[in-house]
Amino acid sequence: MNKNYNLSKIIFNDLISFYKTQLILIFMIFISALLIITIIHKTRLLTSQQEELDIIKKKQMPLNLEKYISTSRLKFKHEKIDT
């Protein structure tokens, strides 16, 4: 009278009956980690695309305008605001 038990089924039933909240929390942590990775990846792609557009715009910019922008940025960096 050997009775065969399906161990994986027993473990699964125990997990569902006794550890529901822990399983839900682990699942939510896993989902949030995947979402964070996806958001970071998309943000980096958008940043690199923006940098490429800036490079293209800079190449198309006339030299006089480029000098004006660089000198005006320097002026704003060194100005002090009195309060």
Curated annotation (Swiss-Prot):
Coiled coil: none annotated. One of its GO terms (biological process) is cell division. Keywords: Cell cycle, Cell division, Cell membrane, Membrane, Transmembrane, Transmembrane helix. Pfam families: FtsL. Its main location: membrane. Residues 42-83 are extracellular. GO terms for cellular component: plasma membrane. It comes from the Bacteria. Disulfide bonds: none annotated. Residues 1-20 are cytoplasmic. It is a single-pass type II membrane protein. InterPro entries: Cell_div_FtsL (IPR011922). It is found in: Cell membrane. The keyword Disulfide bond does not apply. Essential cell division protein. Belongs to the FtsL family. This is Cell division protein FtsL. It comes from Buchnera aphidicola subsp. Baizongia pistaciae (strain Bp). The gene is ftsL.
